[in-house]
Amino acid sequence: LSDKSNQLTLGLTQIEMRKLELARAMAVKPKLLISDETMAGLSSSEVDDILKILINLNEKTKITIIMIEHIMRAVMGFSERVVCLDAGRIIANATPGEVIKNPAVEKAYLGE
């Protein structure tokens, strides 16, 4: 985003805004980052870009990242642990591999 440093945020694209939001959050060196639907509305390649940024942040800073997300590819590719909710109730709390095989998760997300 350094090439956009003199530009108003109104002129930024959606992916640039998401990157700016992450940069602003990280500027205060938090111990915890909550990513709430950061990837909503992004294209597949933009989701990949955000995932790379989050993975890089996690590896370099060892920050804990809580991801609230509906893009399962992103959740499963990023997370060490996944907690799935259905109607506000926890239906799974396990590794991505275990969660993806959980019948309650399949029912909640794909229907019967």
Walk through the language-model features, giving the residues of each.
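Glycine-rich phosphate-binding loops of nucleotide-dependent enzymes
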Residues: 1-112
